[in-house]
């Protein structure tokens, strides 16, 4: 009744408003529900990249009182070795592309330098001797093997040349592209010394950018000897990362390109077979691996 009377007041100013009517209709003690608390501001959590493999671990080997050898330990993994059939500059020597599993091993952060070679062997056979931090060259595969044997005696560890699979695994550093930095050859000068920027000589190791695993000069500067003998293709190649060895085969694998050659030779999959194990040339050097390997 009070509601009706309030609405029928003759004086318009005294008539009840709609809000007054609503208030009168509510039960005694009723209150409108409280507004929900504002949603807390979203907290942005840092996004951690998911590594393809565990992080490589560096360590330093002492060769003499003044000369050391920097190594990088790589975890076991698997990768696609060689060039795909669709590769525009691939040749039959780099096929078929195949999956390879590799055990953990440590590899040199840089190619062996002239200072390191001389500290171990007592001589420097290199042509380009303007800087002791240049990679050693004019070393044969046999010379590289002798260095590894003597370094093993000095350190008490097993040092050797990388297998071809280990070398490509380390070079690619998780990539599947032409180069370990991508497919664009115009970027090669940031990562490698090759015919387009070398002025036809070697340069100190580590002057260019490394690959994703912190390895320098995997492309360019000097070709690097591998443990394996030469084969014309990857047909029947080992899938366990071991060296592919043949008795009485005197041609060995070289990888990585050099200061003398064009970008095609610096591709991660490129294989060079021009040299017998006893030949020396100013294009050829090596880097070492620490870890047990298979022997024939």
Set out the residue ranges of the language-model regions.
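Short, well-ordered surface patches within globular domains
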Residues: 79, 114, 131-189, 225, ...
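A short glycine-rich, aromatic-capped structural motif
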Residues: 61-126, 139-142, 219-220, 227
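Regulatory extensions appended to serine/threonine kinase catalytic cores
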Residues: 31-47
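C-terminal lobe helix-coil module of Hanks-type protein kinase domains
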Residues: 1-33
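Protein kinase-like catalytic domain
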Residues: 8-11, 121, 152, 171, ...
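Short, well-ordered junction/capping motifs at the entry into regular secondary structure
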Residues: 192-219, 247-248, 273-277
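Acidic glycine-/aspartate-rich tracts in secreted/extracellular proteins
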Residues: 84-86, 112, 123-124, 174-176, ...
């Amino acid at each position: 009744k009070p509601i009706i009377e309030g609405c029928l007041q003759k004086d318009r100013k005294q008539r009840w408003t709609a809000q007054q009517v609503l208030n009168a209709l509510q039960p005694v003690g009723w209150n409108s529900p409280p507004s929900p608390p504002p949603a807390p501001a979203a907290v942005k959590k840092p996004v951690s990249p998911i590594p393809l493999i565990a992080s490589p671990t560096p360590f330093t080997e002492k060769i003499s009182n003044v000369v050391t050898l920097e190594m990088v330990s790589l975890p076991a993994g698997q990768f696609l070795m060689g060039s795909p059939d669709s590769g525009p500059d691939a040749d039959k020597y780099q096929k078929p592309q195949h999956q390879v599993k590799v055990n953990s091993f440590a590899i040199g952060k840089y190619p062996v330098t002239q200072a390191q070679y001389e500290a171990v062997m007592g001589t420097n056979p290199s042509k380009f001797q303007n800087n002791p931090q240049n990679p050693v060259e004019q070393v044969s595969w046999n010379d590289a093997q002798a260095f590894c044997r003597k370094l093993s005696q000095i350190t008490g560890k097993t040092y050797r040349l990388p297998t071809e699979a280990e070398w490509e695994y380390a070079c690619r550093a998780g990539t599947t592209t032409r180069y370990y930095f991508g497919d664009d050859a115009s970027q090669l000068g940031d990562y490698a010394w090759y015919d387009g920027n070398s002025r036809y000589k070697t340069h100190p190791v580590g002057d260019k950018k490394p690959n994703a695993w912190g390895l320098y000069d995997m492309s360019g500067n000097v070709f690097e000897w591998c443990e394996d003998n030469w084969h014309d293709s990857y047909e029947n190649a080992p899938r366990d990362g071991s060296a592919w060895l043949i008795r009485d085969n005197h041609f060995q694998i070289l990888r990585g390109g050099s200061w003398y050659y064009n970008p095609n030779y610096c591709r991660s999959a490129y294989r060079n077979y021009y040299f017998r194990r006893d030949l020396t040339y100013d294009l050829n050097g090596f880097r070492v691996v620490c870890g047990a390997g298979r022997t024939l």
